[in-house]
Amino acid sequence: MAGEEVKEIDEFEELGFEPATEETPKKKKKEKIIRSIEDLPGVGPATAEKLREAGYDTLEAIAVASPIELKEVAGISEGTALKIIQAARKAANLGTFMRADEYLKKRATIGRISTGSKSLDKLLGGGIETQAITEVFGEFGSGKTQLAHTLAVMVQLPPEEGGLNGSVIWIDTENTFRPERIREIAQNRGLDPDEVLKHIYVARAFNSNHQMLLVQQAEDKIKELLNTDRPVKLLIVDSLTSHFRSEYIGRGALAERQQKLAKHLADLHRLANLYDIAVFVTNQVQARPDAFFGDPTRPIGGHILAHSATLRVYLRKGKGGKRIARLIDAPHLPEGEAVFSITEKGIED
């Protein structure tokens, strides 16, 4: 009997198992190391291919996705999607608590793009921030698109001159992008205009669905340039709300419009945070018929946009061709105003 028992144990060990005895306790199963999306639980080759095709090709991209998004693109259950996201967050070290002093150090790594105006830069805490959405709204001719053109040039400067050595993605919804204006600003700031134009990638959006699709496609260009000497550091949407405003008319369409706008803004936030880029959007205004005192204008987009934009700046015309920028909302800055001019250099004091 003893011989048979030894034989059974030997056969057990030949299969690659170690018998658990009092002297040799059972070994704990090693936790799987997750380095790519294929390593995530519930992600097989077919699911991984679907995720990659939809742009979810990194742990970070999956970690900041919603279960409903993954469910739709990968054809999986919402429960499986949630487990995949939770595993990605753990592997990418996202969604965990951080001490405030450590968060302050992280904030110190945020880049800033000069607007070309020292007074406006001061108002914004040093310029347009990466990892944030900056919304500028105002009436026609207030300087929104001029500021966008200036930023598209300034971001290409080295950090010591107010830039980030970066490229630009520009989503144009109103046919207002002008390469001639970019050339003029670049020339008057001592830059090679042809080189500046080479690092601006422009797409015209013809409706709100196309606009949202272009934001998704922008991620491909961001990834393509990520490890080059000119990574994308600025994404401009000029204007953010024009298509949504014209396509969804009346109170009956308001809920659907706001849902789509919220999804659009969530996509922009994800790109800003995931790839350390500055998102700059312009917005239109409308008159408030019930306003009897003060400025009767208000930005389009309602509470959805008000809560989604990190910084909100209101532009208006001043005397003598000057423009006045008022910081309406920012989580870390006080309200205030700055005066600037629009010249052949773009925006300046």
Swiss-Prot record:
GO biological process terms held by the UniProt record: DNA recombination; DNA repair
Q: Where is this region: Disordered?
A: 1-32
* A GO term, aspect molecular function: damaged DNA binding
Q: Does the keyword Transmembrane apply?
A: no
Gene3D superfamilies from the xrefs? 5' to 3' exonuclease, C-terminal subdomain, P-loop containing nucleotide triphosphate hydrolases
Q: Which InterPro entries match?
A: AAA+_ATPase (IPR003593), DNA_recomb/repair_Rad51_C (IPR013632), DNA_recomb/repair_RadA (IPR011938), DNA_recomb/repair_RecA-like (IPR016467), DNA_repair_Rad51/TF_NusA_a-hlx (IPR010995), Hlx-hairpin-Hlx_DNA-bd_motif (IPR003583), P-loop_NTPase (IPR027417), RecA_ATP-bd (IPR020588)
Composition bias (Acidic residues) maps to: 7-16
Protein residues bound to ATP: 138-145
Matching entries from Pfam families are given as: HHH_5, Rad51
Give the keywords, sorted: ATP-binding, DNA damage, DNA recombination, DNA-binding, Nucleotide-binding
What's this protein's function? Involved in DNA repair and in homologous recombination. Binds and assemble on single-stranded DNA to form a nucleoprotein filament. Hydrolyzes ATP in a ssDNA-dependent manner and promotes DNA strand exchange between homologous DNA molecules.
What protein family is recorded? Belongs to the eukaryotic RecA-like protein family.
- Which HAMAP family does UniProt cross-reference here? RadA_arch
Q: Which PANTHER family match?
A: MEIOTIC RECOMBINATION PROTEIN DMC1_LIM15 HOMOLOG (PTHR22942:SF30), RECA/RAD51/RADA DNA STRAND-PAIRING FAMILY MEMBER (PTHR22942)
Q: What is this protein called?
A: DNA repair and recombination protein RadA
Q: Which organism is it from?
A: Pyrococcus furiosus (strain ATCC 43587 / DSM 3638 / JCM 8422 / Vc1)
